[in-house]
């Protein structure tokens, strides 16, 4: 079969040769109107927050069909935007917290109502100093497991992991793999090999949205698709219904009471979580902000991931990325 590159909007997809462009486009899951809307929203957000890189992916929850996939980058805030098609490279993110919670719940050693003591927001683990975002305000102290995730406590994640898996890193990483965090290994139409670095909290954008989509699907993980093929199942049930329900409850609380309030909208009920990672040296700090979630919560139709990268503060996944997530949700509702 002859395969070539085919451009739709701002993404390039490898596609079988066909007789005409109309036939080619009809094979793809991309919604051209939605692709253009997502591009506009991403561009506006990047200008507003002075971001140098940004990505947005919209996936149909039940099928795994990718309805929009936009990537933009620029050398600095004065340079023009250029499209990027890299949705496969693992990037550092705090989103592993959700995978840690689900894997821990599956052991039966952890429940949402259990408490963890994150103290004053500073914790030493394996010679690494871990700080919560509010460490300079005295930290959270004793909190429930559910609130640790909803409040984006890095220390909370470590304590949850330690309680469920002790110091057995190989057992933890195996448990993370068991629930599908880091799947799939490839996507037809994306010319890349997908990798995940659990130990370094790195995962590719397409793998992260696939994991969240499985949670939205009540544990059913479907293969992300750029072609209108039949739905392909990666795993019919990544975890028990009880554990999935607990994670969904936590993601909903993140929106209503936790750090994800900026993603909330009065047009529908959403669930999701954000994160912020600082990279680079102290003289040239770069921040990677993301937010991933789904809606509506009672019967999810779409799963969305947004990622923004910028130099310097202010930078927050639960503010900047969450705001873009909300705008995409409202655009999808408007398009109905």
Where would I find each of the regions flagged by the language model?
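Conserved SxxK-family serine transpeptidase/carboxypeptidase catalytic domain
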Residues: 223-224, 228-336
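Short, well-structured active-site flanking segments
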Residues: 79, 105-126, 219-228
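Short pre-catalytic segments that frame enzyme active sites
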Residues: 29-96, 108-109, 127-128, 194
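Active-site-proximal helix/loop microenvironment
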Residues: 70, 86-95, 183-233
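Conserved catalytic neighborhood of penicillin-recognizing serine enzymes
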Residues: 62, 110-113, 118-172, 233-245
């Amino acid at each position: 079969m002859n395969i070539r590159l085919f451009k739709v909007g701002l993404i390039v997809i490898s596609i079988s040769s066909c007789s005409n462009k109309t036939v080619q486009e009809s094979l793809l899951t991309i919604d051209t109107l939605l692709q253009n809307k997502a591009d506009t929203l991403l561009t506006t957000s990047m200008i507003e927050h002075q971001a140098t890189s940004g990505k947005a992916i919209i996936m149909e929850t039940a099928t795994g069909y990718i309805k929009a996939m936009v990537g933009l980058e620029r050398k600095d805030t004065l340079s023009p935007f250029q499209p990027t098609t890299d949705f496969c490279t693992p990037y550092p993110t705090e989103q592993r917290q959700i995978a840690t919670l689900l894997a821990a719940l599956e052991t039966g050693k952890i429940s949402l109502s259990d408490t963890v003591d994150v103290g004053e927001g500073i914790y030493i683990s394996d010679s690494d100093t871990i700080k919560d975002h509010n460490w300079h305000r005295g930290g959270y102290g004793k909190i429930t497991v559910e609130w640790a995730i909803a409040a984006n406590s890095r220390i909370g994640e470590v304590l949850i992991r330690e309680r469920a898996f002790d110091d057995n890193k190989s057992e933890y990483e195996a448990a993370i793999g068991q629930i599908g965090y880091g799947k799939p290994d490839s996507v037809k139409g994306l010319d890349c090999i997908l990798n995940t670095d659990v130990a370094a909290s790195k995962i590719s954008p397409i793998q992260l949205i696939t994991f969240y989509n499985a949670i939205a699907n009540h544990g059913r993980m479907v293969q992300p698709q750029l072609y209108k093929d039949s739905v392909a199942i990666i795993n019919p049930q990544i975890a028990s219904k009880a554990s999935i329900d607990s994670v969904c409850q936590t993601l909903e609380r993140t929106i209503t009471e936790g750090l994800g309030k900026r993603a909330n909208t009065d047009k529908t009920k959403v669930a999701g979580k954000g994160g912020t990672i600082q990279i680079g040296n102290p003289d040239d700090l770069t921040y990677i902000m993301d937010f991933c979630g789904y809606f509506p919560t009672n019967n999810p139709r779409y799963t969305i991931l947004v990622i923004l990268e910028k130099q310097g503060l202010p930078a927050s996944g639960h503010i900047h990325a969450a705001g873009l997530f909300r705008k995409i949700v409202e655009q999808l509702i408007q398009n109905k």
